[in-house]
Amino acid sequence: MTTSELIERINKLIDVVDKAINKREFYPPRLTKYETARIIGARALQLAMGAQPLVDIQEVGSVDPVLIAMEELRRGLLDFIIVREMPDGKTMRIRLKELLELERTL
């Protein structure tokens, strides 16, 4: 990565943070490790209880619900809503697909 590319990425991140602060948009503009773990765990439980996988099991190469859930998350196929609590006590609801799309633009 060149210096100019790095500076461009930093500027994009600064713009996202500024929007989040000024417009109360969601921040951080990515899934946290705790949200990722919660989503994978919840989806793996659904799969273990008999829900239909959203990916072809042959492509994943395993019937393990955790691996299937990880692949579904990686492909952006899950339709979850993330609830984030703000320090002022308000809650923010964010669609997982929107958050993944924003994360990919950074």
UniProtKB/Swiss-Prot annotation:
One of its GO terms (molecular function) is DNA-directed RNA polymerase activity. GO terms for biological process: transcription by RNA polymerase I; transcription by RNA polymerase II; tRNA transcription by RNA polymerase III. Its EC number is 2.7.7.6. It is found in: Cytoplasm. One of its GO terms (cellular component) is DNA-directed RNA polymerase complex. It catalyses: RNA(n) + a ribonucleoside 5'-triphosphate = RNA(n+1) + diphosphate. It holds the Pfam family RNA_pol_Rpb6. Keywords: Cytoplasm, DNA-directed RNA polymerase, Nucleotidyltransferase, Transcription, Transferase. InterPro entries: DNA-dir_RNA_polK_14-18kDa_CS, Pol_omega/Rpo6/RPB6, RPB6/omega-like_sf, Rpo6/Rpb6. It is an enzyme of class 2 (transferase). Belongs to the archaeal Rpo6/eukaryotic RPB6 RNA polymerase subunit family. DNA-dependent RNA polymerase (RNAP) catalyzes the transcription of DNA into RNA using the four ribonucleoside triphosphates as substrates. Part of the RNA polymerase complex. This is DNA-directed RNA polymerase subunit Rpo6. It comes from Pyrobaculum aerophilum (strain ATCC 51768 / DSM 7523 / JCM 9630 / CIP 104966 / NBRC 100827 / IM2). The lineage of its organism: Archaea, Thermoproteota, Thermoprotei, Thermoproteales, Thermoproteaceae. The gene is rpo6.
